[in-house]
Swiss-Prot record:
NCBIfam families: rnpA. This is Ribonuclease P protein component. Belongs to the RnpA family. Consists of a catalytic RNA component (M1 or rnpB) and a protein subunit. The gene is rnpA. It catalyses: Endonucleolytic cleavage of RNA, removing 5'-extranucleotides from tRNA precursor.
Length: 136
């Protein structure tokens, strides 16, 4: 089980990560990864919908993905928010396939995240219009 400090728990946390993060999909999973404050512990959340299968299958997939996530948290302990969405194909995937897809998607999102320019802090754009011209 993941520690509370390493779990995404609120809808707002999930939404922020999915909207502002980078996405990478594989056959069995889609990963969304976003940078958070460097000193904060990395957090991970899982989305396993009913399209994956019945409750037994969903929980099996969730347990496997949680273990893969725990291993990645040992490597990347701070500064990341990760949302893992299981696709219907994950129901029939083996542990090795799930782990391989998870690791490949995480590596890809981390590479894309590293190449992405850091967003500047809000500078208070109240003085300009959308086109950048000064307001009257």
């Amino acid at each position: 089980m993941l520690a509370t400090r390493n779990r995404l728990r609120t809808s707002a946390d999930f939404s922020t990560t999915v909207r502002s993060g980078v996405r990478n999909g594989r056959r069995n999973v889609v990963l969304y990864t976003a940078a958070i404050a460097a000193g904060e512990p990395s957090r991970i959340g899982f989305i396993v919908s009913k399209s994956v299968g019945n409750a037994v299958v969903r929980n099996l997939v969730k347990r496997r993905l949680r273990e893969a996530g725990a291993a990645s948290l040992r490597e990347h302990g701070t500064g990341l928010a990760i949302v893992v969405r299981a696709l219907p194909a994950s129901a029939s995937a083996s542990w090795d396939q799930l782990r391989e897809d998870y690791d490949a998607a995480l590596e890809s999102t981390l590479n894309r995240l590293a190449g992405r320019p850091q967003r500047a802090a809000a500078k208070g754009s109240a003085g300009t219009t959308q086109k950048g011209t000064p307001r009257a």
